[in-house]
Each structure stands twice: as structure tokens, then as C-alpha cells.
């Protein structure tokens, strides 16, 4: 039947409702409180359903409705468009309809990192830059979706960060500017994200730390300058004695539209 339509939308995901109880257990609930999972994929035969529909009609959009991350590499590799609606509430259907019919340009970003499989967990963010990285034998090293990732119906470019000074004593504030441009053909909004990396520190810090962000609405071809104001607190951390430390040194400042390395541009200050 799906072959007879110009485009097909299939809604899959998890169920967090408790409405079927047998012996004190909810067998239909697949997410939520007291429902730990040993895998990140779609429960049941939902992936088989998506594949069966895809065989009949390649113009397919998958909509995830879930309160947890869903990791299905096959869907990411084969389906043209994916919408993660999370748990949108009673008005979620109307909001989703506005998105799929182009009345709203989606601009959401992933609030978490989604691993490709449970074999990638736990993902380590605090590792030394000199540490040798071991690769998986049968799995990619990068996550399925990085933190801050999200597409829209238009495209954007974000310039490299431009600090107000490249040598800073930590007093006052450091202004960091970047320019974001709508390079597509539709009005939309982009979230400019600013990360830092401490090149040398007493304690091993995360490779990337989100310190500021701003969501900017742009018409096609329009550009806007975004300026972030950072204080010394943005570069400080807790040492091994749990004391908040403003340690001097070299820092890399990144700007981009997600935490993925390929989307980030940088500048170094000290």
C-alpha cells in the first residue's frame, strides 16, 4: 500500500505509559521510570516495519517519539529524513504537522550525545590529548549523533571565533565574536555554540566544554554577528582538592553548530 503514495511518514519509538498490568508488571512500557534497557534500538519489530515500508517507497520520513535516545544506524544511513520528536505532548501532532508541511523550519539541537550502540558506552570525554586511541574492531569510533547536532530546511555557515584579545590576564571579560550566515533558500534559526578546550591543565579536563550559545534567526542570505562575553569563571575548574582554580595557560576557543569536530572552527588564546 505504501508504494501508492508520494511520501510516507512512519512513527516509531517507545511507550512510557503504564496501562497494561499483569502480576504487577507493565509489559507494554518500554521507557521511563524503572525501565532500564540493555540496547539503544527500537523495541519489538519496529525496525523491520521501517525496512519493509522502505522497500516499497524510498520517499520515507521516520519520526521518533521517545523519552530516551534511539540509536538505529540503518535508519540513519538509509532514510532521507528523521525527526526526533521526543515526547511532544498532546499538541505534538499539530506541531509535527507544521514541520513536515514546511510551515515551521525545525531548529532543534540534540541535548545529548547518542552512541551508535551500547558497546560505545561509557563514552569518555575527559581524556589526555597524548593518549593513544584504541579503535573498535567492528564499530565506528564516532557517535551516531553528537551533542548539539540538528538540521533544518536551510543551511548555515559560522565563522571562526574572533577574540577581543589573544593574550588575556583573566580580569574583566573576554569578548568572542563570530558571524553566522543563512546560506540556504529558506528563513530559519541556527544555534551558534561556543566551546573551549584547556590545552594544559593539572587535572584532565573534557576535550570540549560548552560555555555559551545563542540562537539566531536569519532570512536567506542574511548574516549576523554574535558576540559572547566570557569571564575567568568560564575557564576555571575544580582541581584534585576540589578547589575552584583559575589556572593560566593556553585555551582553544571553538565556534560551530554542534560539538562534532568537523563543524568547529577555532582560535587560541593564552
Regions found by a protein language model. Give the residues of each.
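C-terminal non-catalytic regions of proteins with extracellular/luminal or membrane-system context
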Residues: 1-270
Amino acid at each position: 500500500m505504501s508504494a501508492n503514495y508520494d511520501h510516507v511518514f512512519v512513527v516509531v519509538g517507545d511507550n512510557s505509559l503504564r496501562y497494561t498490568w499483569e502480576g504487577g508488571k507493565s509489559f507494554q512500557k518500554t521507557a521511563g521510570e524503572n525501565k532500564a534497557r540493555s540496547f539503544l534500538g527500537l523495541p519489538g519489530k519496529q525496525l523491520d516495519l521501517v525496512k519493509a515500508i522502505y522497500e516499497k517507497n524510498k520517499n520515507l520520513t521516520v519520526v521518533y517519539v521517545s523519552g530516551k535516545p534511539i540509536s538505529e544506524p540503518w535508519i540513519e544511513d538509509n532514510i532521507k529524513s528523521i525527526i526526533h520528536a521526543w515526547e511532544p505532548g498532546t499538541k505534538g501532532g499539530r506541531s509535527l504537522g507544521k514541520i513536515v508541511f514546511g510551515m515551521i523550519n525545525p531548529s532543534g539541537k540534540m541535548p545529548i550525545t547518542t552512541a551508535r550502540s551500547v558497546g560505545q558506552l561509557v563514552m569518555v570525554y575527559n581524556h589526555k590529548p597524548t593518549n593513544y586511541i584504541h579503535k573498535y574492531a567492528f564499530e565506528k569510533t564516532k557517535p551516531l549523533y553528537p551533542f548539539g547536532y540538528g538540521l533544518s530546511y536551510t543551511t548555515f555557515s559560522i565563522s571562526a571565533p574572533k577574540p577581543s584579545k589573544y593574550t588575556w590576564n583573566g580580569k574583566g571579560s573576554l569578548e568572542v565574536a563570530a558571524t553566522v550566515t543563512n546560506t540556504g533558500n529558506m528563513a530559519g534559526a541556527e544555534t551558534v555554540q561556543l566551546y573551549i578546550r584547556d590545552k594544559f591543565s593539572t587535572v584532565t579536563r573534557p576535550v570540549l566544554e560548552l560555555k555559551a550559545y545563542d540562537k539566531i534567526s536569519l532570512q536567506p542570505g542574511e548574516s549576523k554577528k554574535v558576540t559572547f562575553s566570557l569571564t575567568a569563571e568560564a575557564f576555571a575548574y575544580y582541581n584534585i582538592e576540589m578547589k575552584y582554580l583559575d589556572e593560566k595557560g593556553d585555551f582553544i576557543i571553538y565556534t560551530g553548530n554542534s560539538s562534532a569536530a568537523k563543524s568547529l572552527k577555532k582560535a587560541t588564546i593564552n
